[in-house]
C-alpha cells in the first residue's frame, strides 16, 4: 500500500527507521565488505595506505548494495568524471582528518567532510572514501553497515500498514552520516564526562598533585571536543540559514534556489542541530565546572600557603621575644661587678625586667602582624589609625566630606576674606584639578 503523508508522519517514520536500524543484527549472509569479516568486528574497515595518484573509496548503489570496496580511481580521471575541481580533493583526501567540517554543494553531488567521514553523495550513489587512521576506520565500518540498511529501505510498518518511504536517496545517505557523527560525539562526551567527573569528585575529598595533572590533560582534550562540536553545530546552522544550499541538496528532484519548500530537509538538519547543540552545552558546562574547581583549588592552596607563612612569622616573633628575654640575664652573667650582687631584689628584678621586655617585644610585633593579616576591600595597610597611613579609604573619604560646622566656617571665611581664601591650600587645588582631569577622561 503506497500513499503520501504529512510532516508529522515523516518525523514518526524517521524515528521508526532508527528503531529498525537498532534492531538489525549482523548475519553471515549479509552482503558487505569481504576483507573485514570477523567474529568480534563483523563490519571493521581496514585503513589504507595513501597514494599521490589515486583516491580510494567504497561505493554504494541506489539499492544500498556495495558495488566496490576500496576501489582506486586516478585523481585526474575522478575529477573529470564527476565534475570536480582539484581543490575539492582536499576535502576528500584520506591522509588526514580535518578539524573544520564542511558541506560542499555541487550541481550533481554533495561533498561531505565531517570529522572522520569523507564522502560524496549523488542522487543514486554514495562514495565513502577510505582513511589511513585505524580509529576512524572502525567508525567507518559502522557507517558502512548503517548506510547499507538505510539506503536499501523502501517500506516501513506504521500502525500495521506498509508505508512507502518517500525520503530522497541523498537525504537518507546524509542522515546516516549525521547519525554516525552524532553517535561518535555522544560516545566521546560520555567518556570525557565519566573521566573528568571522577577526577572532580576525587578532588573534593583530597587535593592531589597527580589528580590536578590528570585534570589538566583531560581538560585539554575536552576543550578540543567542545571546539569540534561547536564547529559542527555552526555548520548545520549555516545550512539551515541558506535556502540556496538547501535547494542545492535536492539532487533527485532539482529545486529552484528561491524555493521555500525545504521542510523535510530542514526537519532533518534541525534534529541533528539540536542534538549537536546539546553536546556543546554539556561540554561547556563541564569545562566551566573544571575551571571553577581549579579556581577553588588555587584559593585553597593560597590560603594554606598564607597560613604557613603566618605560622612562620608567629614562630619568628616568639623567638625574638625569647631572645630579648635572655639578653638581659646574659649581661648580668658576665664576671663584672653590677652592684646588685648583695641585693635581695636583684634576681627578681632581672627576671621581671627580662619577662617584661620579652612581653613588650612580642605583643608589639603580634599587633603589627595582626594588622597585616586584616585585609579589607577598602584598605590593607598596617596602621589604619596612624598619621603615616592616612591613605585609609574610609578615613580619607570622611576627611574630604565637610560637616555642618566646616561648611559654616567656610562660609564665614568667604564673607570675611573673599572666595580667594578657598584656593590658598595647594593640596585642595591639586585635588580639584585631579577631579577635573578624571571627568574629562570619562
Curated annotation (Swiss-Prot):
Transit peptide: 1-15
Coiled coil regions in record: none
Example of a GO cellular component annotation carried by this entry: mitochondrial inner membrane
InterPro entries reported in the protein's UniProt record: CorA_TM1_TM2, MRS2-like
Gene Ontology terms, MF aspect: magnesium ion transmembrane transporter activity
Main localization (coarse): mitochondrion
Keywords for the protein's UniProt record, in alphabetical order: Ion transport, Magnesium, Membrane, Mitochondrion, Mitochondrion inner membrane, Transit peptide, Transmembrane, Transmembrane helix, Transport
The family this protein is said to belong to: Belongs to the CorA metal ion transporter (MIT) (TC 1.A.35) family.
Subunit (UniProt): Homopentamer. Forms homooligomers. Interacts with MFM1.
Main function: High-conductance magnesium-selective channel that mediates the influx of magnesium into the mitochondrial matrix. Essential for the splicing of mRNA group II introns in mitochondria by affecting mitochondrial magnesium concentrations, which are critical for group II intron splicing. It also suppresses a variety of mitochondrial intron mutations and its absence may disturb the assembly of mitochondrial membrane complexes.
Name this polypeptide is given: Mitochondrial inner membrane magnesium transporter MRS2
Amino acid at each position: 500500500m503506497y500513499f503520501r503523508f504529512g510532516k508529522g508522519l515523516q518525523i514518526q517514520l524517521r524515528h521508526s527507521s532508527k528503531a529498525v536500524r537498532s534492531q538489525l543484527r549482523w548475519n553471515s549472509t549479509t552482503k558487505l565488505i569481504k576483507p573485514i569479516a570477523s567474529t568480534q568486528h563483523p563490519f571493521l574497515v581496514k585503513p589504507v595506505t595513501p597514494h599521490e595518484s589515486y583516491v580510494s573509496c567504497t561505493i554504494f548503489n541506489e539499492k544500498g548494495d556495495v558495488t566496490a570496496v576500496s576501489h582506486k580511481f586516478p585523481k585526474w580521471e575522478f575529477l573529470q568524471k564527476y565534475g570536480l575541481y582539484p581543490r575539492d580533493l582536499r576535502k576528500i583526501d584520506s591522509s588526514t582528518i580535518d578539524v573544520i567540517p564542511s558541506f560542499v554543494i555541487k550541481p550533481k553531488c554533495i561533498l561531505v567532510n565531517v570529522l572522520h567521514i569523507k564522502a560524496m553523495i549523488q542522487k543514486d550513489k554514495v562514495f565513502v572514501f577510505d582513511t589511513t587512521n585505524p580509529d576512524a576506520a572502525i567508525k567507518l565500518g559502522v557507517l558502512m553497515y548503517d548506510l547499507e540498511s538505510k539506503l536499501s529501505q523502501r517500506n516501513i510498518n506504521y500502525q500495521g500498514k506498509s508505508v512507502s518511504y518517500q525520503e530522497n536517496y541523498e537525504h537518507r545517505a546524509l542522515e546516516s552520516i549525521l547519525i554516525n557523527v552524532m553517535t561518535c560525539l555522544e560516545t566521546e562526551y560520555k567518556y570525557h564526562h565519566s573521566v573528568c567527573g571522577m577526577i572532580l569528585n576525587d578532588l573534593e575529598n583530597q587535593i592531589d598533585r597527580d589528580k590536578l595533572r590528570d585534570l589538566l590533560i583531560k581538560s585539554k582534550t575536552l576543550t578540543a571536543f567542545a571546539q569540534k562540536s561547536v564547529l559542527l553545530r555552526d555548520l548545520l546552522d549555516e545550512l539551515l540559514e541558506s535556502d540556496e544550499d538547501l535547494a542545492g541538496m535536492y539532487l533527485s528532484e532539482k529545486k529552484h534556489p528561491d524555493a521555500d519548500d525545504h521542510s523535510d530537509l530542514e526537519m532533518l538538519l534541525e534534529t541533528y542541530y539540536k542534538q549537536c547543540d546539546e553536546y556543546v552545552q554539556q561540554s561547556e558546562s563541564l569545562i566551566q565546572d573544571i575551571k571553577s574547581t581549579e579556581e577553588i583549588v588555587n584559593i585553597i592552596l593560597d590560603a594554606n600557603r598564607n597560613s604557613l607563612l603566618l605560622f612562620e612569622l608567629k614562630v619568628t616573633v616568639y623567638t625574638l621575644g625569647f631572645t630579648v628575654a635572655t639578653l638581659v640575664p646574659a649581661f648580668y652573667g658576665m664576671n663584672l661587678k653590677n652592684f646588685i650582687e648583695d641585693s635581695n631584689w636583684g634576681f627578681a628584678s632581672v627576671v621581671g625586667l627580662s619577662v617584661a621586655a620579652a612581653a613588650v617585644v612580642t605583643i608589639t610585633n603580634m599587633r603589627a602582624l595582626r594588622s597585616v593579616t586584616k585585609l579589607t576591600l577598602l584598605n590593607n595597610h598596617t596602621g589604619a589609625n596612624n598619621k603615616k597611613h592616612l591613605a585609609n579609604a574610609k578615613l580619607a573619604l570622611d576627611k574630604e566630606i565637610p560637616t555642618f560646622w566646616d561648611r559654616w566656617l567656610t562660609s564665614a571665611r568667604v564673607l570675611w576674606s573673599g572666595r580667594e581664601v578657598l584656593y590658598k591650600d595647594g593640596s585642595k587645588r591639586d585635588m580639584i584639578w585631579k577631579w577635573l582631569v578624571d571627568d574629562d577622561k570619562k
